[in-house]
Structure formats: structure tokens, C-alpha cells
Amino acid sequence: AEHGFTGGYTIVKDAVRAWKRSHQEVFLPLVHPPGESQVDFGEAIVKLGGQETKVALFVMTLPYSGAIFVQAFPRECTETFLEGHRQAFAFFSGVPRRISYDNSAIAVIKVLQGRERKLTKEFLRLQSHYLFQEHFCLVRRANEKGHVERLLGYARRNFLVPVPEVASLVALNEALAERCRMDLEHRTRGKSGSKGDPLVEDRAAFLPLPKQPFEARRIEQAS
């Protein structure tokens, strides 16, 4: 054979597979200190006024304690993104110091180098009111926001099965908030005590809620 190589195709294929395996990126488990959160949107089907309806689920989780907050909205948009934060901060009685996001167009105008982002004016308005630090996941690094994605699936299985039948979104969200409160009594896997125990440490690390309420609506400047 050319260059003196006498090995077969299978040997080459096995060698390439071994090289790829040895060079695969390894995602180490992330360690989350108290006072941090992750945010995401998902979807679910509910019966609203007798009609099957797809709703958008705003989810905020606290990885340290495992606490979760879920609310349903007609759709994912700037207004529901802002309102979801406002309600989550009220539910948790404080503001997480750092919040992790994907690169949704609601918050990000342009992805720059590394973690640098050009942010939308509405996201900056939210951040300047509550003073939390933003953290945007690197592209194709799903593990950086894995906690909220896992708990989104958990909420679908445990809060929305069987398919809830409600008269209104208000009624659905009251039920979801109650399920989130009840979930604080559950044990966290691998830990002693309930989720409510480490939530005390989360809250101790939170920023205080601002005295002035936040206007969770898109603000357009008059031309």
C-alpha cells in the first residue's frame, strides 16, 4: 500500500473513533452557590375553558435549593418575559444575584465574543431595576442551563399531568403557584431535608426587592 500502510479500513475506522472519543469535550457538573437562578420558557397543553390550548411556561429555578417557580402565559414575548421575572421575584421574596439565560432574542440583540452580548433595551430596563447580574450561556453549551431545563420537564410531569382543566389562565397560575409552594416540602435528591431548607440560604444571598414596583410592559418611545 502507499506509504507502507498495510492496515484495513476497520483499523482506520476504529482509530478515528478512538481519537474522537479522547477529544470529546467533557462537561463537568456545575457547582451552584446560593442566590443564583436560571430562566427558561417551555410549552404545555392545557384545557382552557373546555378547549385544548397551548400555553407558554415561564420557569425560574434556584439550582442550590432546587426551588422552582412556574407561570403560564398565552405566548412567549417581551411582556411575558418581564412579567414572569416580576412574579418570580415576588414568589421567592427576593432577587437572585445572578441569573442564567439562553440567547433568546427577547434579551439579546447580538452575540459577541465569549459571553459578551448586545442586550435589548427592555432587558436592560429589567436589570437596572432589580440589579441582578446576567449570565448568558455559551452557544451550544446546554449544560450551563441544564437545571432549569430538567425542572421544566419535572414541572410538566408533576404539575401538568393529567392535563389540567381550568376556566382561565388566572386559575391555572394560582394552581401552579400552589404546586410550587408544595414542592418546597419535597426532599432534594442526595440531600437531607426538604427544598425549603436550603431555600433559606438562597434567600439570605438574594438582593432585596426594590421598593418601587416594576412596570412589566414594553415601553415604546413616541416618535
Residue ranges, per PLM feature:
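Short, basic interhelical loop/turn and adjoining N-cap
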Residues: E2-I11
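Mobile-element integrase/transposase regions
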Residues: D14-I68, E76-G84, E215-S223
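Short, conserved catalytic/metal-binding motifs centered on acidic residues
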Residues: D40, G66, I99-D102, Q127, ...
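Active-site beta-loop-alpha junctions of metal-dependent nucleic acid enzymes
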Residues: V70-R98
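RNase H-like two-metal-ion nuclease catalytic core shared by retroviral integrases
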Residues: Y101-D102, Q113-G114, E134-R156, V170-L172
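RNase H-like polynucleotidyl transferase catalytic core
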Residues: E122-F123, S128-K145, P164-V166
